[in-house]
C-alpha cells in the first residue's frame, strides 16, 4: 500500500467489512485502513479472541488504548488490504472527547486548609495526651 496512488487503493464499504467477522475471515479497520487478520489470529500475543471481538468493525480506539509497540505497528502494515470507503468514514463512531471538570478555587479552601489543620491539631493533642500518661 505504501507509495501507491489513490487510484490504486482498494476501497471497501463498511457493509462489506462487517461480513468478515469470523475465524475464517477476520477483517478490522484501523485508522480507516482495512486489515485482513485471518492469518494472524493464532499469532496475536493478546490471543485470538481479542481480534475476533473487533472483527468486522473499527478497532482503532482499542488498538491505541493497548499501546502497541513500533514493531507491532510495522507488522500490522503487512496485513493492509485496502481502505474504508470515504463515504462510510462518517458512519464509524468517533471516540468521545474526554470531559475535564474543574473545581472553583474558592470552594476548596475548606478542604485544603481547615480540615488538614484540624486533623493535625487532633493528632498533636492525642500525641501529647499519650506522652503525658507515660
UniProtKB/Swiss-Prot annotation:
<keyword id="KW-0408">Iron</keyword>
<dbReference type="GO" id="GO:0005789">
    <property type="term" value="C:endoplasmic reticulum membrane"/>
</dbReference>
<keyword id="KW-0813">Transport</keyword>
<dbReference type="GO" id="GO:0046872">
    <property type="term" value="F:metal ion binding"/>
</dbReference>
<dbReference type="InterPro" id="IPR050668">
    <property type="entry name" value="Cytochrome_b5"/>
</dbReference>
<dbReference type="GO" id="GO:0004768">
    <property type="term" value="F:stearoyl-CoA 9-desaturase activity"/>
</dbReference>
<feature type="domain" description="Cytochrome b5 heme-binding">
    <location>
        <begin position="9"/>
        <end position="85"/>
    </location>
</feature>
<feature type="modified residue" description="N6-acetyllysine">
    <location>
        <position position="7"/>
    </location>
</feature>
<comment type="similarity">
    <text>Belongs to the cytochrome b5 family.</text>
</comment>
<dbReference type="InterPro" id="IPR036400">
    <property type="entry name" value="Cyt_B5-like_heme/steroid_sf"/>
</dbReference>
<dbReference type="InterPro" id="IPR001199">
    <property type="entry name" value="Cyt_B5-like_heme/steroid-bd"/>
</dbReference>
<keyword id="KW-0812">Transmembrane</keyword>
<dbReference type="Pfam" id="PF00173">
    <property type="entry name" value="Cyt-b5"/>
</dbReference>
<dbReference type="GO" id="GO:0005783">
    <property type="term" value="C:endoplasmic reticulum"/>
</dbReference>
<keyword id="KW-0492">Microsome</keyword>
<dbReference type="GO" id="GO:0005739">
    <property type="term" value="C:mitochondrion"/>
</dbReference>
<feature type="modified residue" description="N-acetylalanine">
    <location>
        <position position="2"/>
    </location>
</feature>
<keyword id="KW-0472">Membrane</keyword>
<keyword id="KW-0479">Metal-binding</keyword>
<feature type="binding site" description="axial binding residue">
    <location>
        <position position="68"/>
    </location>
    <ligand>
        <name>heme</name>
    </ligand>
</feature>
<feature type="modified residue" description="N6-acetyllysine">
    <location>
        <position position="19"/>
    </location>
</feature>
<keyword id="KW-0349">Heme</keyword>
<dbReference type="GO" id="GO:0005829">
    <property type="term" value="C:cytosol"/>
</dbReference>
<keyword id="KW-1133">Transmembrane helix</keyword>
<dbReference type="GO" id="GO:0020037">
    <property type="term" value="F:heme binding"/>
</dbReference>
<keyword id="KW-0249">Electron transport</keyword>
<dbReference type="GO" id="GO:0006631">
    <property type="term" value="P:fatty acid metabolic process"/>
</dbReference>
<dbReference type="GO" id="GO:0019899">
    <property type="term" value="F:enzyme binding"/>
</dbReference>
<keyword id="KW-0256">Endoplasmic reticulum</keyword>
<feature type="binding site" description="axial binding residue">
    <location>
        <position position="44"/>
    </location>
    <ligand>
        <name>heme</name>
    </ligand>
</feature>
<protein>
    <recommendedName>
        <fullName>Cytochrome b5</fullName>
    </recommendedName>
</protein>
<feature type="modified residue" description="N6-acetyllysine">
    <location>
        <position position="10"/>
    </location>
</feature>
<comment type="function">
    <text>Cytochrome b5 is a membrane-bound hemoprotein functioning as an electron carrier for several membrane-bound oxygenases.</text>
</comment>
<dbReference type="GO" id="GO:0016020">
    <property type="term" value="C:membrane"/>
</dbReference>
<dbReference type="InterPro" id="IPR018506">
    <property type="entry name" value="Cyt_B5_heme-BS"/>
</dbReference>
<feature type="transmembrane region" description="Helical">
    <location>
        <begin position="109"/>
        <end position="131"/>
    </location>
</feature>
<keyword id="KW-0007">Acetylation</keyword>
Amino acid at each position: 500500500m505504501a507509495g501507491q496512488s489513490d487510484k490504486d487503493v482498494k476501497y471497501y464499504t463498511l457493509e462489506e467489512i462487517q461480513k468478515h467477522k469470523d475465524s475464517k475471515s477476520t477483517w478490522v479497520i484501523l485508522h480507516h485502513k482495512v486489515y485482513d487478520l485471518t492469518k494472524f489470529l493464532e499469532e496475536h500475543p493478546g490471543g485470538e479472541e481479542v481480534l475476533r471481538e473487533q472483527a468486522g468493525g473499527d478497532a482503532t480506539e482499542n488498538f491505541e488504548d493497548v499501546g502497541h509497540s513500533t514493531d507491532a505497528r510495522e507488522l500490522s502494515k503487512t496485513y493492509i488490504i485496502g481502505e474504508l470507503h470515504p463515504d462510510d468514514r462518517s458512519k464509524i463512531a468517533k471516540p468521545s472527547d474526554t470531559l475535564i471538570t474543574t473545581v472553583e478555587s474558592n470552594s476548596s479552601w475548606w478542604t485544603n486548609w481547615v480540615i488538614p489543620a484540624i486533623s493535625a491539631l487532633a493528632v498533636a493533642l492525642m500525641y501529647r495526651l499519650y506522652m503525658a500518661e507515660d
